[in-house]
Amino acid sequence: MKLTQDLTSDGPDPPVLGKPLTRAFFGRSVHDVAPDLIGATLLVDGVGGIIVEVEAYHHTEPAAHSHRGPTPRNMVMFGPPGFAYVYRSYGIHWCVNFVCEMDGSAAAVLIRALQPTHGIPAMRRRRGLHEERLLCSGPGRLCQALGISIAHNALPLDAPPIAVFRRTEKADVVAGVRIGITKAADLPWRYGLKGSKFLSKPFRSAGY
């Protein structure tokens, strides 16, 4: 499957060709995991798509939830890699992160956007709209489309209902500053698939 090809929601879902990612994949530096996730496939109960945009966060910088230390809300970030960290943003939208690095490192990758490939009818029902480009183009949108909530917090990424599959072809990854933050706003820790129409926001340096 070409990462930038247009897909239709008619007919059966395409097969997932990549191998499931193990917890060892997420045990690496968050700055290696984040770009390597571009082109991977995220499914929750069989609904999801290709990851096209992410952001990296680490406890050493003030934009991270873990910067001030562990709390009941962010405790999952301080645990072992390969687990989901789910929180509510502005009291409205759920956001899903993948915990990375060694136990106690408090690093995670925020999943910002997907290219829908699986369970698109279910996504449309949950989102209340038809346009595929808008179904998962943002962290809150994709959580609504995939049915992700606090019930998924602290769940492993390598066991049902969550599955993450390795990309099967090289991805053309671009980088830029993160979105919607005021601290450490100059760090180029946002990564995306160049040319994707499913991004939450274009990359200024990407020329499109």
UniProtKB/Swiss-Prot annotation:
InterPro entries linked to this entry: Formyl_transferase-like_C_sf (IPR011034), MPG (IPR003180), MPG_sf (IPR036995)
Protein name, per record: Putative 3-methyladenine DNA glycosylase
Homology family: Belongs to the DNA glycosylase MPG family.
Top EC class for this record: hydrolase
Keyword Transcription belongs to the record: no
Keywords recorded for this protein, A-Z: DNA damage, DNA repair, Hydrolase
GO molecular function: alkylbase DNA N-glycosylase activity; DNA binding
One GO term of the biological process aspect: base-excision repair
Top-rank taxon, per record: Bacteria
EC number(s) recorded for this UniProt protein: 3.2.2.-
